[in-house]
Amino acid sequence: MKKILLPILAALLLISGLPVAAADTEAAALKLTGLDKKLTDGNHLTAAECGEIKLSADGEISSLYIIFHSKVQEFTIKSGEKTETVTSEFLHMLTDVSAFKSSELTVDFGGAKISDIYAFAAGSLPDFVQKWEKPLQRADILLNSSHSDDDQLFFAGLLPYYASRGCDIQVVYYTDHKNETRRRHELLNGLWTVGIKYYPVISNFPDYY
């Protein structure tokens, strides 16, 4: 028995001596200067109409996290001779700009109303940054909700429970709260908080009560 245990113990000691891979470095939030205060106040309910704006940060910008106020819109990013057009799909939009390798970017929003703009260096992004994926064609669970708060009020336990178990969950809303900007942001913030990563499907029916 000792002859069997000794080689196993020796192997375990060797493994314990191996270097452990370092954890991902957290992405530093970069300070943006020269912008309207409404774009950096962290308040989704304030907004500024943005045409071409210049972003200047205190470090190389790897990603931009853009919070549209109520409607998504295509925008263009430029730096030097390089230009990229971004087709917005999400109200809370994360965009990779690491290819520009610059601390200064010119972004043309074409008059879109923007609530907030965040800039990050390379690394693991903070939890509040929402990296949405496109809605699923096939899901393990499909949750239909009449209003944006019904999913949290009546299914608040279901969503985090199955999301934590790796289930692909798609949420569908029958009403679009275009007349209530706050609820559109609360909808996304609530889903992200409970572990949903696929962007919700939202119909065009208005909400009346």
Residue positions per predicted region:
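Active-site rim/loop-helix segments in enzyme catalytic domains that contact anionic ligands
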Residues: K31-D41, A47-A48, H92-L94, A99-Y209
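Bacterial N-terminal signal peptides
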Residues: I8-S16
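Disordered, acidic Ser/Thr/Pro-rich linker "stalks" and the adjacent N-terminal cap
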Residues: G17-I61, H69-S70, E74-F75, S79-E81, ...
